[in-house]
A protein has these predicted regions:
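Active-site helix of classical SDR
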Residues: 123, 159, 167
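Alpha-helical segment proximal to the catalytic Tyr-Lys
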Residues: 128, 172-176
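Short, small/polar-rich loop/turn modules that mediate ligand/substrate recognition or access, typified
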Residues: 135, 175, 180, 234-236
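Conserved glycine-rich Rossmann-like NAD(P)H-binding loop of the short-chain dehydrogenase/reductase
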Residues: 32-48
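C-terminal substrate-recognition "lid" of short-chain dehydrogenase/reductases
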Residues: 213-241, 246
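Substrate-binding pocket helix/loop in short-chain dehydrogenase/reductase
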Residues: 99-100, 107-112, 194, 205
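Residue(s) in the substrate-gating loop at a strand-loop-helix junction
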Residues: 143
């Protein structure tokens, strides 16, 4: 199928789309009538469960953040299946905390590479297809800690801050191609990742958050869909959705 032979449905690719925020984004997009490539690395069963709920709209695709050679294949699989690509939501990532002086150097750099390498590789692979998309857009899911920093998160915050700089710079590069690039910076959200947060730290975060609670994946997904589908006059923006934690 030629990429100019678009049908009515928009096509999105969501990295890390089988769990947590990514799964909520995948579901929210299908509810909008989009068809979605939902990438996974180890969560194939999770991706297939999402696809079972919307078999005509969800395509599970394997993509390994640690191996950027899998990015072109992931994009090619989606375009081969549905003919074009309109939006890319770069959500896949990994958290690992710890004070800098107490963190092994290899482990520290692994967090940086895991969060950045696959993101950049997937964006690079998708751009030649996005230029043919309708109202094409890229959303990078960063973090509020990448905006203001957070003690004990130098690697994760460093990677997420780099995503913001990457996204804003890419927005300037591809604007002439009609591609919007925006960054979503969630605060603390209830996911498998934050289940590991100790109760004492959770209570402190809730006290620091103006709205007094962790966010939900559905709340973050709504913001991601807004940036991807509705924010047609936004590019290079950073949308913080953190319940007021950063105030």
């Amino acid at each position: 199928m030629d990429e100019n032979d678009h049908d009515e449905s928009r096509v999105a690719l969501v990295s890390g789309g089988s769990r947590g925020i990514g799964a909520a984004v995948t579901t929210a997009l299908t509810q909008r009538g989009c068809r979605v490539g939902c990438t996974y690395r180890t969560g194939r069963d999770d991706a297939e469960k999402i696809a079972a709920d919307a078999p005509e709209q969800v395509l599970p695709i394997r993509f390994d953040l640690h191996d950027d050679t899998t990015a072109p294949t992931a994009v090619a699989d989606l375009v081969s299946h549905w003919g074009h690509l309109d939006s890319l939501i770069l959500n896949a990532g990994q958290w690992s905390g710890g004070r800098l002086v107490e963190t092994d150097a290899d482990a520290w750099w692994s967090v940086i590479e895991t969060n950045l390498r696959g993101t950049v590789a997937l964006a690079r692979a998708a751009l030649p297809h996005l230029v043919h998309g309708r109202s094409p857009s890229i959303v990078l899911v960063s973090s509020v800690v990448g905006v203001i920093g957070h003690a004990g998160d130098t690697a994760y915050a460093g990677a997420k801050s780099a995503m913001i700089g990457f996204g804003r710079s890419l927005a300037k590069e591809v604007a002439r191609d009609g591609i919007r690039v925006n960054v979503l910076a969630p605060g603390f959200v209830t996911t498998d990742m934050t289940d590991a947060v100790p109760d004492s730290a959770r209570r402190r975060i809730e006290r620091e958050t103006v709205l007094g609670r962790f966010g939900t994946v559905d709340e973050i997904a709504k913001a991601a869909v807004f940036l991807s589908e509705d924010a047609t006059f936004c590019t290079g923006s950073v949308l913080t959705v953190d319940g007021g934690w950063a105030l």
